[in-house]
Amino acid sequence: MTYNLEFHPLALKEWKKLAPSFQQQFKKKLQQRLANPRVPASKLSGHTDAYKIKLRTIGYRLVYTVKDDVVVVYVLAVGKRENNKVYESLVSRQP
């Protein structure tokens, strides 16, 4: 089963600010995650059903949650890892 992709409004703003080359890298990984969104190695500790995609070379993270009832991968945040900024934004962005 393939999941659909949706963005939190603030995550969409963050996405649009990314350089096109970074967006392409995330798109490749998101395509894989839409087929299999629950990757145990990418699960965030301390968050219920939240996962991350890392672009290590540039230090960016994309954090998403999985909504099985509507078959959606919901992007919560996109940003740099420095000072855990991207992870702290999750508190106010739960779906």
Which residues does each PLM region occupy?
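Short, charged low-complexity linear motifs
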Residues: 1-2, 45-50, 73
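A short, surface-exposed loop/turn module that caps and links secondary-structure elements
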Residues: 31-56
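Compact soluble domain cores
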Residues: 21-35
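Enriched for short, Lys/Arg-rich terminal
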Residues: 2-5, 10-17, 24, 55-60, ...
